UniProtKB/Swiss-Prot annotation:
Keywords of the record: Ribonucleoprotein, Ribosomal protein
Xref: Gene3D superfamilies: Ribosomal protein L14
Family: Belongs to the universal ribosomal protein uL14 family.
Alphabetized SMART domains for the sequence: Ribosomal_L14 (SM01374)
Name the record gives this protein: Large ribosomal subunit protein uL14
CDD domains, per database record: Ribosomal_uL14
Record-linked Pfam families: Ribosomal_L14 (PF00238)
Length: 141
């Protein structure tokens, strides 16, 4: 009597976890933040004593380490849009980026507080976080 997960709707293909709590990622939007320090990962349920880690498309709680003074020392929501750790898509392609990056989003974690994103965005990151991130991206990979 094993647990069967056939025909489960709404589950996404698993992306390799790449960014543990304490990681510093680039901020790829034009809000004025330069670096984001990951404090926690929303919706993470893991093993005892294991550091929570984020992957593409995950919503994280982050603070701004470098950037405009009005953004610093505040806890903000962000979505991871690029990661250096490679992951495999269902079609067999293996993809990775040359940096780790995220964008600041609103308190619900849906739409970004941005009007521009620098660099490409993975298509896995655009789906869960709403249409705004995908529409402001110069390239979707």
């Amino acid at each position: 009597m094993g647990k069967e997960k056939a025909n489960v709707k709404g589950c996404r293909f698993r992306v390799s976890l790449a960014l543990p709590v304490g990681a510093v990622v680039n901020c790829a939007d034009n809000t004025g933040a330069k670096n984001l320090y990951i404090i926690s990962v929303k919706g993470y349920h893991g093993r005892l004593n294991r550091l929570p880690a984020a992957a593409l498309g995950d919503i994280v709680m982050a603070s701004v380490k470098k950037g405009k003074p009005e953004l610093r020392r505040k806890v903000l929501n962000a979505v991871i849009i690029r990661q250096r750790k490679s992951w495999r898509r269902k079609d067999g392609t293996v993809i990775y980026f040359e940096d780790n990056a995220g964008v600041i989003v609103n308190s619900q974690g849906r739409d970004g507080r941005v009007s521009g994103i620098a660099g490409p965005v993975a298509k896995e990151a655009g789906r869960p976080s709403g249409p705004k991130i995908s529409s402001h991206a110069p390239a979707i990979v």
